[in-house]
Curated annotation (Swiss-Prot):
NCBIfam families: PRK00418.1. The lineage of its organism: Bacteria, Pseudomonadati, Pseudomonadota, Gammaproteobacteria, Vibrionales. Inhibits all the catalytic activities of DNA gyrase by preventing its interaction with DNA. Acts by binding directly to the C-terminal domain of GyrB, which probably disrupts DNA binding by the gyrase. The gene is yacG. It comes from the Bacteria. This is DNA gyrase inhibitor YacG. Interacts with GyrB. Its cofactor is Zn(2+). GO terms for molecular function: DNA topoisomerase type II (double strand cut, ATP-hydrolyzing) inhibitor activity; zinc ion binding. HAMAP family: DNA_gyrase_inhibitor_YacG.
Amino acid sequence: MTKPTTEQPTTVKCPTCQSAVIWNAESPFRPFCSKKCQMIDFGEWADEEKSIPGAPDMSDSDGWSEDQY
């Protein structure tokens, strides 16, 4: 005989408003709680308020050119 499972659903915090979001197929905007929070986050990336750290871009002032290769 098996015991009935009473597992709690996996939840995550909405990256924008920190509300709890159940992680399943019925949460269409996951990890966001709503379309509004999803669009706020998208706008922050588009305005470059958020970024992924990395090496700085090379520019012409760095002495780089295609002729060196």
